[in-house]
Amino acid sequence: MFLSRVNPTRFPPFVASRRLFSASASAASLQQYCTEKPPIKPWPQRLFPKRLVSMITQQQNIDLALQIFLYAGKSHPGFTHNYDTYHSILFKLSRARAFDPVESLMADLRNSYPPIKCGENLFIDLLRNYGLAGRYESSMRIFLRIPDFGVKRSVRSLNTLLNVLIQNQRFDLVHAMFKNSKESFGITPNIFTCNLLVKALCKKNDIESAYKVLDEIPSMGLVPNLVTYTTILGGYVARGDMESAKRVLEEMLDRGWYPDATTYTVLMDGYCKLGRFSEAATVMDDMEKNEIEPNEVTYGVMIRALCKEKKSGEARNMFDEMLERSFMPDSSLCCKVIDALCEDHKVDEACGLWRKMLKNNCMPDNALLSTLIHWLCKEGRVTEARKLFDEFEKGSIPSLLTYNTLIAGMCEKGELTEAGRLWDDMYERKCKPNAFTYNVLIEGLSKNGNVKEGVRVLEEMLEIGCFPNKTTFLILFEGLQKLGKEEDAMKIVSMAVMNGKVDKESWELFLKKFAGELDKGVLPLKELLHEISVS
């Protein structure tokens, strides 16, 4: 049997990491957080554990939350910590990845007298939070130390640990822990445990072994469920083996399990990724025939596939259907549909989609606004783009990306006065321009023959500490060349070098340009080399 192939590994009482929950480190680590006076005012005259839990939970500052906890235990007359107060502070600290005080407090909890009776939920929370921080080894140590606190480990903590190991891609350890669960930990796996093992095997692309686990589950007195089958089906889909995935679907049906929206969506996603869109559409038809409602993920998979296939009309129709069913599409999906419509020269339809989203209380964000502004400007409809921007600005704060997109469109159309007004609006909103913002403005000025003003903008760019790049210098050099003022190029180089704002690519541009023109006697290379030597 597959499940018995791994030799049982003894997990002895944990002695390898005595630093974890070490009492010797506890006092010193927490001393810096202790205060003689109440850390917050007003401090309650009467304090009960429930009130303290509320104070800790509501406190946004992690250090202050810990100070409140310590002051209550050491300085408030008659107050004694209990399991709930420890749980609240340990959860808050571990969630914020403040692990040093966590380990010190755990040492205090373990050594408390009289002993504080703990529950398993505390350890489950710690397992999760250490795992989310990528510290799966610490999660394993915590799991092994649970009995030290007078708590019996259950299948819940085992399943939490297995999930942590999967999140951290330690699939080999999942099988080892599963195999040793009963003998070393006294825990009998349940179907959720088996599903986690199946998931780990599928993640490491060992679907054949996952299938063997599926076959052996009944011998453990358990019944494979929909999640078991869907996980294996997803494994085949990830491999691109759609025929095997279909066989799993048929086996599910034969054994009396009816696929849900997730199962169908996984199958559809596999077909879409392989470009087999018609088969994905057939799966969606089957789904509806079986009276299974698609969810937001189902719609997302199909809409993205339609956009990729350049079928903007069908994507728009499905998007409308999604909104009608009260599903809220995410920003990236909206941008996909807007892009597909605009690439198909349906900018008006894209604007209509924007208005429909507003009507459905689905507030567009900066990414979506920037996408639509980009296409409106590309079509030469800068005035409409500005109106859209103003409409958005009434209820939201435009991002730098949104400002950059509209400024670029205005500069491209030669509407420099409007671009300047928008620039001023940026400053009023304390939205700091970046190299791209300066580049589009400099390019707009240069294209309109106002290179002198472009150089002034470069000076401002250098003054605020924004690094020009190769593109910035190319724009100005080309502008000077058109005006027959190439001799002024060295002044720009000197200005940049004096401010220490020249990157490697820009230096290469300078050397290539000026070394190539040395023989013409236009720009002396010696000047450039001198600038480099003194910078």
Curated annotation (Swiss-Prot):
It comes from the Eukaryota. One of its GO terms (cellular component) is mitochondrion. It is found in: Mitochondrion. PPR repeats lie at residues 82-112, 119-153, 154-189, 190-224, 225-259, 260-294, 295-329, 330-364, 365-395, 399-433, 434-468, 469-503. PROSITE patterns: PPR. Keywords: Mitochondrion, Repeat, Transit peptide. Residues 1-28 form a transit peptide. It holds the Pfam family PPR_1. InterPro entries: Mito_RNA-Proc/Resp, Pentatricopeptide_rpt, TPR-like_helical_dom_sf. Belongs to the PPR family. P subfamily. PANTHER family: PENTATRICOPEPTIDE REPEAT-CONTAINING PROTEIN 1, MITOCHONDRIAL (PTHR47933), PENTATRICOPEPTIDE REPEAT-CONTAINING PROTEIN 2 (PTHR47933:SF11). This is Pentatricopeptide repeat-containing protein At5g16420, mitochondrial. It comes from Arabidopsis thaliana (Mouse-ear cress).
